[in-house]
């Protein structure tokens, strides 16, 4: 395993632990999710380039599309929640209210 792959896996695990530790704030959770998607994108791109497996060239592009959709939905929810409740604490949301 090369040093670049180990660094990317370390970045993914750091983002995952950040997501688990800072799940109380929506903005921190979204940033950790973006870090995970960025490391996954780079890892899949490097793996495809190293193996010369041409049938899976579209996988990084599909991953970028999912990351962009996740970011757009996450930011829309963040704006809606922060304008409604005045904070981005996930614990302050009561999902049972109408």
From Swiss-Prot:
Main localization category: mitochondrion
Pfam families cross-referenced by the UniProt entry: Oxidored_q2
One GO CC term on file: respiratory chain complex I
Keywords annotated in UniProt: Electron transport, Membrane, Mitochondrion, Mitochondrion inner membrane, NAD, Respiratory chain, Translocase, Transmembrane, Transmembrane helix, Transport, Ubiquinone
Keyword Transport annotated: yes
Enzyme Commission number: 7.1.1.2
Transmembrane portions of the chain: 1-21, 29-49, 61-81
GO biological process annotation, one example: ATP synthesis coupled electron transport
Compartment(s) of residence: Mitochondrion inner membrane
EC class name: translocase
Gene Ontology MF, one: NADH dehydrogenase (ubiquinone) activity
Keyword Transport: yes
Topology of this chain in the membrane: Multi-pass membrane protein
Catalytic activity: a ubiquinone + NADH + 5 H(+)(in) = a ubiquinol + NAD(+) + 4 H(+)(out)
Family note: Belongs to the complex I subunit 4L family.
Biological role stated in the UniProt entry: Core subunit of the mitochondrial membrane respiratory chain NADH dehydrogenase (Complex I) which catalyzes electron transfer from NADH through the respiratory chain, using ubiquinone as an electron acceptor. Part of the enzyme membrane arm which is embedded in the lipid bilayer and involved in proton translocation.
Subunit structure: Core subunit of respiratory chain NADH dehydrogenase (Complex I) which is composed of 45 different subunits.
Protein name per UniProt: NADH-ubiquinone oxidoreductase chain 4L
Source organism of the structure: Platanista minor
